Swiss-Prot record:
Source organism: Pyricularia oryzae (strain 70-15 / ATCC MYA-4617 / FGSC 8958)
Name of the protein described by the UniProt record: Eukaryotic translation initiation factor 3 subunit I
Role of this protein: Component of the eukaryotic translation initiation factor 3 (eIF-3) complex, which is involved in protein synthesis of a specialized repertoire of mRNAs and, together with other initiation factors, stimulates binding of mRNA and methionyl-tRNAi to the 40S ribosome. The eIF-3 complex specifically targets and initiates translation of a subset of mRNAs involved in cell proliferation.
Localization (cell): Cytoplasm
Family classification: Belongs to the eIF-3 subunit I family.
GO molecular function: RNA binding; translation initiation factor activity
Gene: TIF34
Upper classification of the organism: Eukaryota, Fungi, Dikarya, Ascomycota, Pezizomycotina
Keyword annotations: Cytoplasm, Initiation factor, Protein biosynthesis, Repeat, WD repeat
Length: 341
C-alpha cells in the first residue's frame, strides 16, 4: 500500500476531509492555508486564502459546491470550491474548533472555544447552497455549554440531533430544532478530552477518539456505547470505514511529551481495528509525529491521514485489505452464497 504524499502545508495538519464523492481532499493546517487535492493522484487543485490564523476545521457540503472553514481568527468562512472565492464570513468572540454541514447541506454548525470570559458554544447557521445568494448573517441557534466546553460536534441522521463531545470526556445529545439538551453520558474517563467524532455513513452511530487512549462506537439515539477500541497512546482521531467492518485510529504522544526520536517509540501509526470484534488487525506507519486526523474515502477504497509533520498521506487499499476475513465472516459468506444457489 504505497501512499501518495501531499506536501502543501508548512505547519501541523489539523483536519483532512474527502468530499462526498471521494474525488477531492481538503486539508487545513496551522499555517493559514486551505488546500484542495485530487484524491486519485494527489495533484493540487488549488488553495483558498483569507484566514488570518491557524485553521482548525473544514467541511464540504453534500453537493461539493461550497466548503466551510473555522479558524483561530474567530471566523467561519464559506468558499466556492470551483473558484476559491470567499462567499461569506461569520465572526465570533472566540476561535472556531469544528464545523459540519447538516446532511442536506442547508445548515452549518460551528463549535466555538471557551476563552476570555466567553463560554464555549455550538452555533447553528442557515446556509444557502447557491453561490450567488446572499447568506444570512444571523445565527439560527446558539447552544451554550456551561458545564464542560464542547470540543467536537456533528449532526445525527436526518439532522434530528446535534451530538457533541466535551472536554471532560462526556458526550451530549441536543434537539437540533430548539437546542434543548436531551441526554448526556460520561463515556470516556473523567477529564479526558474527546478529540474527534466521526459518523457512520447512515449517521445512526459514531466513533469518538479521546485522550484516555480509547476510541468508542456510540449510538446516536440513546448514546449507548457499543464497542471500545483500546490503544496504547492518546488518540486524536478515529474513523469508521465504509464497505468493510473496520475502524482506523490515529494518535501518538503529543509532540511535547516525546523524548525519543524513533517514530516507533512515539507510536505514530494508523491502527486498524475490526469494528465488530474490537481486535487490532494491523498498523500503517509513515508519519514522523502524531497523526492529528484520519479520514476514510467515502467509497471505501482508501483513507487519508494528516500529521503533526505537515504531510497528508493518501493510501489506496490493496486487494488483501478487501479479501481479509475472520473465519466466522467467511463461513457466513459461504452460507449466503449456497443459499442463493
Amino acid at each position: 500500500m504505497r501512499p501518495i504524499l501531499l506536501s502543501g502545508h508548512e505547519r501541523a495538519l489539523t483536519q483532512v476531509k474527502f468530499n462526498p464523492d471521494g474525488d477531492l481532499i481538503f486539508s487545513v493546517a496551522k499555517d493559514q492555508h486551505i488546500c484542495v487535492w485530487f484524491a486519485h493522484n494527489g495533484e493540487r487543485l488549488g488553495t483558498y486564502h483569507g484566514h488570518q490564523g491557524a485553521i482548525w476545521t473544514v467541511d464540504c457540503d453534500p453537493t461539493s459546491t461550497i466548503i466551510a472553514t473555522g479558524s483561530a481568527d474567530n471566523t467561519i468562512k464559506l468558499w466556492e470550491i470551483k473558484t476559491g472565492r470567499c462567499l461569506h464570513t461569520w465572526e465570533f468572540p472566540t476561535a472556531v474548533k469544528r464545523v459540519e454541514f447538516s446532511p442536506d447541506g442547508t445548515r452549518l454548525l460551528g463549535v466555538t472555544e471557551k476563552r476570555m470570559g466567553h463560554l464555549g458554544t455550538i452555533v447553528v447557521l442557515d446556509v444557502k447552497l447557491d453561490v450567488d445568494a446572499e447568506q444570512n448573517p444571523e445565527r439560527a441557534m446558539t447552544i451554550v455549554c456551561d458545564e464542560s466546553k464542547a470540543t467536537v460536534a456533528g449532526w445525527s441522521y436526518l439532522a434530528k440531533y446535534i451530538i457533541a463531545g466535551h472536554e471532560d470526556g462526556s458526550v451530549s445529545q441536543y434537539d437540533a430544532k430548539n437546542g434543548d439538551q436531551l441526554h448526556s453520558v460520561q463515556i470516556h474517563d473523567m477529564g479526558s478530552e474527546i478529540r474527534d467524532l466521526q459518523w457512520s455513513q447512515d449517521r445512526t452511530y459514531f466513533i469518538t477518539a479521546s485522550k484516555d487512549k480509547t476510541a468508542k462506537l456510540v449510538t446516536a439515539r440513546d448514546l449507548e456505547v457499543l464497542k471500545t477500541y483500546p490503544a496504547d497512546t492518546p488518540l486524536n482521531s478515529a474513523v469508521i470505514t465504509p464497505k468493510k467492518d473496520y475502524v482506523i485510529l490515529g494518535g501518538g504522544q503529543a509532540a511535547m511529551d516525546v523524548t525519543t526520536t524513533s517514530a516507533r517509540q512515539g507510536k505514530f501509526e494508523a491502527r486498524f481495528y475490526h469494528k465488530i470484534f474490537e481486535d487490532e488487525i494491523g498498523r500503517v506507519r509513515g508519519h514522523f509525529g502524531p497523526l492529528n486526523y484520519v479520514a476514510a474515502e467515502p467509497n471505501g477504497k482508501g483513507y487519508a491521514s494528516g500529521g503533526e509533520d505537515g504531510y497528508v498521506r493518501v493510501h489506496q487499499f490493496d486487494k488483501g485489505y478487501f479479501d481479509f476475513m475472520y473465519e466466522v465472516e467467511r463461513e457466513r459468506k459461504n452460507k449466503m452464497e449456497q443459499a442463493q444457489q
